[in-house]
């Protein structure tokens, strides 16, 4: 696998592949990789002739008092895992490469509406940072296909909306959430959990599953939401949000809606965990 922190190196290699008529898939990450990321890379390898990955802990998407400085950097292990999974080119830019004028003078991309609810309400500016860095990476790599995890459901919709609105010729593919045996969604932030917290953490998925089951049986949104929040609190979580939304727009779900998604974010110890369930009724 070729690794470079320089934009020109990435463009040169991709141009060489393009000159031979070959296709390119892209998997952007922040590093500290787990099996969920590796699944994205393997899926990417099945879609295109070549796979490009990136590792960049993006300061623009972290708010004040968030874990930018503490976010684990594990480049050597990540590189080994990416190579084994089929990545051929790894882009590892520094903040200076991506934001040479600094964050305050950086042009940014903002996807209105869908960016301002749920995680966007709890983390102001987060999705502006996500959309900006992903747009920049797309312009550098210019892939045919880009893959993202369904665990970050709102992020996936933000990116799909950006690609559609800006007429970018890229297919965005969401890949199913990879879970531990307990049902806990794999996340780089699971490393913040103590043993006791990790044992309690599967309650997040259990609460979401119970909500969906009740809704399918005709229970009210309000009743199932309150029950699920109570279960989370009993398990040691502090809920940030737990909501039922329209699966395509993230607008508040209405009783007549069929395509639904339950989205949750909750704190346990030092970790903020998110999860979701997309379903039809």
UniProtKB/Swiss-Prot annotation:
It comes from the Bacteria. ATP binds at residues 30-37, 149-152, 178, 186-189. Pfam families: Pantoate_ligase. GO terms for biological process: pantothenate biosynthetic process. SUPFAM superfamilies: Nucleotidylyl transferase (SSF52374). Its main location: cytoplasm. The reaction proceeds by a bi uni uni bi ping pong mechanism. This is Pantothenate synthetase. It comes from Shewanella baltica (strain OS185). The gene is panC.
């Amino acid at each position: 696998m070729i690794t470079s922190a320089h934009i020109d190196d990435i463009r040169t290699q991709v141009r060489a592949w393009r000159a031979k008529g070959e296709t390119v898939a892209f998997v952007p990450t922040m590093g500290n990789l787990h099996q969920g990321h590796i699944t994205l890379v393997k899926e990417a390898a099945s879609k295109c002739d070549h796979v490009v990955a990136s590792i960049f802990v993006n300061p623009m998407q972290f708010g004040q008092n968030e874990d930018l400085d503490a976010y684990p950097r594990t480049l050597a292990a990540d590189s080994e895992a990416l190579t084994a999974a089929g990545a051929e080119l790894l882009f590892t830019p520094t903040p200076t490469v991506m934001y040479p004028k600094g964050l305050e003078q950086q042009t940014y991309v903002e996807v209105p509406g869908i960016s301002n609810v749920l995680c966007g309400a709890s983390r102001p500016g987060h999705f502006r940072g996500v959309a900006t860095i992903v747009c920049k990476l797309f312009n550098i790599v210019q892939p045919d296909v880009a893959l993202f995890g369904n665990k970050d459901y709102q992020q996936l919709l933000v990116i799909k909306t950006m690609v559609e609105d800006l007429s970018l010729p890229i297919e965005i593919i969401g890949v199913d959430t990879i879970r531990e045996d307990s049902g806990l969604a794999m996340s780089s932030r699971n490393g913040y959990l103590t043993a006791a917290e990790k044992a309690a953490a599967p309650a997040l998925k259990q609460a979401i599953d119970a909500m969906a089951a009740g809704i399918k049986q005709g229970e009210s949104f309000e009743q199932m939401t309150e029950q699920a929040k109570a279960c989370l609190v009993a398990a040691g979580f502090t809920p940030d949000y737990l909501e039922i939304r329209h699966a395509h727009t993230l607008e508040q779900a209405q009783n007549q809606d069929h395509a639904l998604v339950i989205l949750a974010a909750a704190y346990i110890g030092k970790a903020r965990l998110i999860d979701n369930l997309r379903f039809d009724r």
